[in-house]
């Protein structure tokens, strides 16, 4: 239930803010705004459909819904943070004007450029994160301790963090992590 409360907060607080700012940035053409509106309607519908019918839906369907909604949840956090940075920049402009004249003269184009910059930036970040999860790296760290440990001169330790094991990071991926861990031959 705690996870639902967290994600419902994101759905009901972050999505309207992202929608409002994105809608303002898009040109007032139906060809631009209708797909944007549909994206938010479909995502919200999918989220509530998955939540309401989570006990009745087959696992493969609910896991697919979780992949989509969890990905959007994380992306919406990054998008909101980006938008808040832009809000601070905009606030600084109101306090002490510093934007170049060409930017003020082409404000709609500037907003559209920032819209796509955020979309592509967050998309790139999400792709990189997915790649990192699917292809974990082994990093060797050598630590010298000033104390003697009996007759041992070395110790191999394997550490993994931030796995977030659940429906999305499931059994297959965990087995991959365990195999990678065992390949290091820990003591």
Where are these regions (language model features)?
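Membrane-embedded segments
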Residues: 133-187
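Non-catalytic terminal accessory segments
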Residues: 1-134
């Amino acid at each position: 239930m705690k996870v639902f409360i967290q994600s419902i907060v994101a759905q009901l607080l972050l999505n309207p803010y992202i929608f409002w700012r994105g809608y303002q940035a898009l040109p007032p053409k139906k060809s631009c705004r209708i797909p944007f509106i549909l994206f938010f309607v479909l995502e919200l519908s999918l989220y509530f459909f998955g939540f309401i019918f989570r006990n009745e839906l087959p696992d493969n369907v609910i896991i697919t819904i979780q992949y989509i909604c969890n990905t959007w949840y994380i992306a919406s956090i990054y998008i909101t943070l980006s938008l808040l940075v832009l809000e601070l920049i905009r606030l600084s402009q109101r306090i002490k004007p510093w934007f170049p004249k060409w930017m003020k003269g082409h404000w709609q184009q500037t907003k559209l450029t920032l819209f796509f910059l955020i979309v592509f930036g967050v998309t790139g970040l999400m792709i990189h994160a997915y790649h990192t999860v699917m292809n974990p790296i082994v990093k060797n760290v050598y630590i010298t301790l000033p104390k003697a440990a009996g007759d041992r001169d070395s110790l191999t330790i394997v550490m993994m963090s931030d796995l977030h094991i659940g429906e999305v990071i499931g059994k297959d991926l965990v087995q991959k992590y365990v195999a990678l861990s065992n390949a290091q031959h820990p003591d």
